[in-house]
Every structure is written in structure tokens, then in C-alpha cells.
């Protein structure tokens, strides 16, 4: 074996790709699979999904007739309709022949159901792609066999990884236009596995496909590619696993307090993680009050349990102060509360993310003020994080978040609902970023500047200690102290004086 061949073999062992016959031994996950197609411009994402819909009989008769009519004059050399038209819903998309918005479609086989998001390939629509990736379990990354990996391909793979996706299918599309060149397929597969390894992704399956002809999409392409004996795309999707929200304890972000009468008080929301049943002890955050679950109610039923994804009304065994935006959680597995967190985000607006600017942060139904300090920006070509004081639109960056009052999060790796957030510009109400929590930061306190004054957001006991000092009395014109939910006191007087 030559040195390059040996290196390739070692890499292929590091990045796991299970043959369908081995994967079939795993217990089948029958829950709906959410997937995203991504890649560079004109790699054939919409055509691939259109072909999936067509070959799984998910296209209704009126849609098929409309497709034939809209494809009039656009038929390819094979006389096939333009399957991408099944996805391109916006007039601008049809006129330009590109995808702009994120298009969601549902289809099913006799083994499983699927929700697929077709995302735009153009760089200026990277933010739309990030939206689609935020809820996906698996990414199908398309690459034009004639062109290979491009910067936008790497960008999409990186964003998908940052959004928590750990299962990738590399679809080397338009393989027919290379005369079904196996060497070309192997080269692209190896390059992507190197990229996947650098991103920490180990589960990659590479497939040579022709989306237009439908080869290796639903039906195998062995007649044209006898050298490929792996699974088709649909076989891989049927055996993929979904991300479970059971990895952390019970989470119920409170959306509404229900009081139809004086005898009933319930807390409504969608379970974001774990499970709950009557008798369980729970904690209300950020207050820290404890209660037991008395009853679980849905629209017309009293339930004996609820799990992630269920919309419920939770009744507790005692009167406690619970408001919209609070989180009800397992008492033995609580989310993290704090004034400072580390996060990664994607900038979504032309103004980008400015250093030290204060935004509204919204996570679930909780909305609070936060100061954002960019730390670094990802360079897509090298995969390195470079120092950054600000983040332009479409940039992927690491930031520090400093809150005025206690924030409640899991990390995004633990829970994609309670670990995700958006940033809103208070001046324009535009959503300027979508992000995910990576860790809690050790913090002195919530400290930020407003014009010429320093604002300290501190636990109430520490705030009282500080305001009783001579140092604070001498700096009263320059410093304002705001009380927040009680927490562990930290000695910051020396830091203020410095």
C-alpha cells in the first residue's frame, strides 16, 4: 500500500461510515427525522429533494400536473421535469433559478417519516441556512462532482456542526456528468472526511448520486455504478437517529400562566427536555422555589406523564410565584443560572455585531437585556478562530454575554431548546443574530457602561454590602448598583477601585 493510500485508509477508519447491513442491526429509530440539505450554489439541493418527493410518491396529482406545466420548455436532455420547482416557492427563486428562503417539505416511506429543509447556497443567504440547521438531526451536504468542495460547502458544514448536527451524508451529485468516475468520487469523499474530522464529526456516509436521474436517491444506481455497493440515500435516512431531548432533566419554559377561575392555576408551555409525572419535585427558576407536580393537563385530558415535545399545563401542589419566562425544571438536574455565559452565534444583519452593544436576548419566552462582546471569528478556509472585536453579517463568532439579571440556560449540546437564543436590536427590533450557549463564565458580576456611568448588577446581599462601604459613597456619581436574584456573593470592591 502506498503512503497516500495508507493515509486515506487511516482517515476512513477514523471517520465512521456504517454499511447499511451493519446499521440495520441497530434498533430502528422510528421518530420523524428532520434533515437539511446544504452545499454551494447549483450543487442540486432542490433537485435532490424534488426527486426524493417524486420517487417516494409524496407529490400529489395536482402538484404533478403543475410541475409538468411549469417545466414546459425547461425539460432537460432526458425529457424529465424540473424537480427543483417542487421546492422553489418564491417568485424571485423561480425567476433566478436559485433558493433564497428555507423550504420545508414532508414525505414518508413505509418505514419512517421525514421533514426536510432545503436551504440556500448563496453566501448572502447563509443566515437562512443557519435557521434550517438549528432544528435538524442530519445534514445532507451536496457537492458537484465536477467542481468538488468549495468555500460555501465548508461554510455550510461548519455551521451545521456548530448547530449540533453530528450525522452527515455527503452526496456527490452529478456523478453522471463525470462519466461515473470512481476516482473522482473517492477524492471528494476523502477531502470531506478530512474536513469532518477537523470539525469533530465522525459519522459520515458518502454516496455518489445523480439527483436528476434518481440514481442512488431512492432507487440504486448499480447499472451505472457497479463499483458502488453501498446504501441509497433513502436507506441511510431511514436508519438515522434523532437527537434526543432526554439527555438532561425535565424542562418547561413557561409561556403562559392559566387562571380560568380562582380554583385553578396552571403553567403552560411545551416540554423542552426530559419527562415529568405527578408527584415529581420541581424547581422554579430563577427564584429557586420548590414544589411538587400535582396534575398534568392537556387540551381535553389529564395525563399521567409528559415528555419532550408535549404541550401541557402543569399544576403544582402549592401556590408559588411563577411568571412567563420562568423555567420549571427537575430539582435533581437543573439548568445553569448566572450573569455571564460564553456563546457562539451567526450574525444575521448588515450591521453585524458591535462590541459592547446592548441587545435584547430572547430564549423561549424569556427576554432580557444583555451586553455582547465579540471574542473571535471563524475563518472558514483554515478552520481557525481569529481574534475579532466585531462580527460582520454572516460571520460565525464566539462572544461573551453579560446579563443585568440572572439568565437560565443549558448548553446547546445538552438541550437545543434551552441552549439557543436570538439577539434583537432594541432600536430596530431586527433579529441580528442566532446563537447557542457553550458554557457559563466565571463572572465578577454584571458590569457594563451606560454613557459615563458604570452599572453593577449584583446579588441583593452583595449589593447591600457594597453600598454600605465608604468606597461606594465616594463613587456614587460614577457607579449605579442594581439588585438581582440572590446568588453567591463575590468580593469585587478591589476590582471597582482598580
Swiss-Prot record:
InterPro entries reported for this sequence: CysN_GTP-bd (IPR041757), CysN_II (IPR044138), CysN_NoDQ_III (IPR044139), G_TR_CS (IPR031157), GTP-eEF1A_C (IPR054696), P-loop_NTPase (IPR027417), SO4_adenylTrfase_lsu (IPR011779), T_Tr_GTP-bd_dom (IPR000795)
Region span, G3: 118-121
Pathway stated in the Swiss-Prot or TrEMBL entry: Sulfur metabolism; hydrogen sulfide biosynthesis; sulfite from sulfate: step 1/3
Matching Pfam families: GTP-eEF1A_C, GTP_EFTU
Domain tr-type G residue range list: 30-246
Top-rank lineage group of the source organism: Bacteria
Binding site for GTP: 39-46, 118-122, 173-176
Enzymatic reactions: sulfate + ATP + H(+) = adenosine 5'-phosphosulfate + diphosphate
GO MF annotations in UniProt: ATP binding; GTP binding; GTPase activity; sulfate adenylyltransferase (ATP) activity
Key word Thylakoid present: no
Ranges where the record places region G2: 97-101
Keywords: ATP-binding, GTP-binding, Nucleotide-binding, Nucleotidyltransferase, Transferase
Classification via PANTHER family: TRANSLATION FACTOR
Function as written in the Swiss-Prot or TrEMBL entry: With CysD forms the ATP sulfurylase (ATPS) that catalyzes the adenylation of sulfate producing adenosine 5'-phosphosulfate (APS) and diphosphate, the first enzymatic step in sulfur assimilation pathway. APS synthesis involves the formation of a high-energy phosphoric-sulfuric acid anhydride bond driven by GTP hydrolysis by CysN coupled to ATP hydrolysis by CysD.
Classification via HAMAP family: Sulf_adenylyltr_sub1 (MF_00062)
NCBIfam families: CysN, PRK05124.1
Complexes and interactors: Heterodimer composed of CysD, the smaller subunit, and CysN.
Family according to the record: Belongs to the TRAFAC class translation factor GTPase superfamily. Classic translation factor GTPase family. CysN/NodQ subfamily.
Protein name: Sulfate adenylyltransferase subunit 1
Organism: Rhizobium meliloti (strain 1021)
Name of the gene this protein is made from: cysN
Amino acid at each position: 500500500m502506498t503512503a497516500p493510500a495508507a493515509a486515506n485508509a487511516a482517515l476512513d477508519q477514523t471517520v465512521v461510515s456504517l454499511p447499511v447491513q451493519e446499521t440495520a442491526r441497530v434498533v430502528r429509530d422510528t421518530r420523524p427525522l428532520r434533515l437539511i440539505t446544504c452545499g454551494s450554489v447549483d450543487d442540486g439541493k432542490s433537485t435532490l429533494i424534488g426527486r426524493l418527493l417524486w420517487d417516494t410518491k409524496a407529490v400529489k396529482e395536482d402538484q404533478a400536473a403543475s410541475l409538468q406545466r411549469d417545466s414546459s420548455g425547461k425539460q432537460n436532455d432526458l425529457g424529465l421535469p424540473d424537480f427543483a420547482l417542487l421546492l422553489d416557492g418564491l417568485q424571485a427563486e423561480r425567476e433566478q433559478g436559485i433558493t433564497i428562503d428555507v423550504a420545508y417539505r414532508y414525505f414518508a416511506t413505509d418505514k419512517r417519516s421525514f421533514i426536510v429543509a432545503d436551504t440556500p447556497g448563496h453566501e448572502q443567504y447563509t443566515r437562512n441556512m443557519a435557521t434550517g440547521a438549528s432544528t435538524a438531526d442530519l445534514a445532507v451536504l451536496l457537492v458537484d462532482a465536477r467542481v468538488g468542495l468549495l468555500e460555501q460547502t465548508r461554510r455550510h458544514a461548519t455551521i451545521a456542526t456548530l448547530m449540533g448536527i453530528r450525522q452527515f451524508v455527503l452526496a456527490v451529485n452529478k456523478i453522471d456528468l463525470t462519466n461515473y468516475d470512481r476516482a473522482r468520487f473517492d477524492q471528494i469523499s476523502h477531502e470531506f472526511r478530512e474536513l469532518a474530522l477537523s470539525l469533530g464529526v465522525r459519522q459520515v456516509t458518502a454516496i455518489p448520486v445523480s439527483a436528476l436521474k434518481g440514481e442512488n436517491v431512492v432507487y440504486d444506481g448499480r447499472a451505472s455504478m457497479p463499483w458502488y455497493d453501498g446504501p441509497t440515500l433513502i436507506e441511510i435516512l431511514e436508519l438515522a437517529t434523532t437527537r434526543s431531548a432526554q439527555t438532561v432533566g425535565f424542562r418547561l419554559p413557561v409561556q403562559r400562566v392559566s387562571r380560568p377561575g380562582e380554583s385553578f392555576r396552571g403553567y403552560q408551555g411545551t416540554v423542552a427536555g426530559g419527562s415529568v409525572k405527578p408527584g415529581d419535585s420541581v424547581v422554579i427558576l430563577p427564584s429557586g422555589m420548590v414544589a411538587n407536580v400535582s396534575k398534568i393537563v392537556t387540551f381535553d385530558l389529564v395525563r399521567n406523564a409528559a415528555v419532550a415535545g408535549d404541550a401541557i399545563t402543569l399544576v403544582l401542589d402549592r401556590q408559588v410565584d411563577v411568571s412567563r419566562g420562568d423555567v420549571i425544571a427537575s430539582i435533581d438536574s437543573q439548568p445553569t443560572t448566572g450573569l455571564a455565559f460564553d456563546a457562539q452565534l451567526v450574525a444575521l444583519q448588515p450591521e453585524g455585531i458591535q462590541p459592547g452593544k446592548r441587545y435584547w436576548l430572547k430564549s423561549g419566552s424569556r427576554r432580557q437585556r444583555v451586553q455582547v462582546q465579540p471574542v473571535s471569528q471563524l475563518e472558514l478556509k483554515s478552520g481557525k478562530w481569529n481574534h475579532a472585536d466585531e462580527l460582520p453579517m454572516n460571520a460565525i463568532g464566539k462572544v461573551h454575554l453579560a446579563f443585568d439579571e440572572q439568565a437560565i440556560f443549558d448548553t446547546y449540546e445538552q438541550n437545543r431548546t434551552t441552549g439557543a437564543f436570538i439577539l434583537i436590536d432594541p432600536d430596530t427590533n431586527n433579529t441580528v443574530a442566532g446563537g447557542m450557549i457553550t458554557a457559563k463564565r466565571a463572572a465578577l458580576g454584571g458590569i457594563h457602561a451606560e454613557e459615563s456611568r458604570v452599572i453593577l448588577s449584583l446579588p441583593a446581599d452583595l449589593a447591600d454590602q457594597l453600598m454600605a462601604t465608604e468606597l461606594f459613597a465616594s463613587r456614587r456619581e460614577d457607579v449605579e448598583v442594581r439588585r438581582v436574584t440572590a446568588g453567591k456573593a463575590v468580593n469585587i470592591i478591589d476590582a471597582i477601585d482598580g
